[in-house]
Amino acid sequence: TETAGSVGYDLAGASYDSVSFSVASQDNIPTGLVFNTAGTKLYMGGTQNETIYQYTLSTAFDLGTASYDSVSFSVSGQESNLQGFIFSADGAKLFVVGAGSDTVYQYTLSTAFDLSTASYDSVSFSVASQDSNPYDVIFNDDGTKMYIAGIGTDAVYQYSLSTGFDLSTASYNSVSFSVSGQDTTPVGIRYNDNGTKLFMIGATTDSIYQYSLSTAFDLTTASYDSVSFSVASQGTAPQGVTLSADGTKMYVVDAIGDAVFQYSTVAYTQTLDLSTGTTFSFTPSGATTVSLTNPPATGIAIGFTVEIIGDASAITWPSSVKWPAGVAPTATATKELYTFVTTDGGTTYYGKKAAEGIS
């Protein structure tokens, strides 16, 4: 049995989708972007007009289907240098951070994710004591933790809210995490769906960096994964990053190109169950990691073949596979056949390419 799967939030395998969407007609200095939960609404903030704009996507998270709703919301009454913004999980609250006042502002939307119903709550929270140039704001799932990225100190700061998504209950945790080793202008941050990965986009290197948190949403447990992805080929002034709900798509807004760019961040997997047969075949959807499961017991030899139809150039085999001369064979974009043998219960597999260019 062959079982295909996919995993999101894979920055190491990220690729540009050759899909972009211009926001120049709304703002010439776009600085942030957010989706609603369903991916059918996109929001872009711009510091030219200190305004957030609302767009509709007819296909969820597909930037190629985006169009402007002719709906916007000005925050100029509170902030003169809009940089980042985020919604609460239910879309009933909006939070804006800016480098003009070094402050986070809270708004209410009477209809979830509908900017036309937004109003200021007259609630704010200063982060100036931590950073004089805050550029982004995000929360954990229940709104009891808030995080600020600042370019004044090249760090991310953590705050607690005793009542979720209620900025009036916020306090600084005295917890911060420096990203200066990767980029000295951290303009955007996002978590994955469970808070074990943090992504930071930097405007100095035009790259996105990946970090792991051993305890979800706890910055004291963060460490750099030594994984990054350059977006310089699309734009040299990235200002914000966000991801789809499942992490298979990533989006970057650029202030020079005045556009949003779409990327794929999905890793494909293929699991081969050796208890179900000795002949397997699959067609990769992209870069794929192969797993071999349920080999026979030690002392029982088994041989099996794997047919790969299509481009096998980005196949990652298990480390337990030993190849001739210690190197996995060079793959081609044609149909290929691989053979494997194990006699020790799958501790070691001996593999070789048996044929290629099969028609």
Predicted regions located by residue number:
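Short loop/turn segments immediately following the C-termini of beta-strands
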Residues: 47, 99, 151, 203, ...
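Blade-level signature of beta-propeller repeat domains, shared across WD40, Kelch, NHL, RCC1
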Residues: 199, 239-266
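Short loop/turn segments immediately following beta-strands, especially the blade-tip
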Residues: 2-11, 56-65, 106-117, 160-169, ...
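Residue-level detector of Asp-centered blade-edge/turn motifs that repeat once per structural unit
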Residues: 37-38, 89-90, 141-142, 191-194, ...
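Exposed extracellular interaction/assembly regions and N-terminal maturation sites
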Residues: 267-318, 335-336, 341-359
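A short beta-strand motif characteristic of beta-propeller blades
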Residues: 17-24, 69-76, 121-128, 173-180, ...
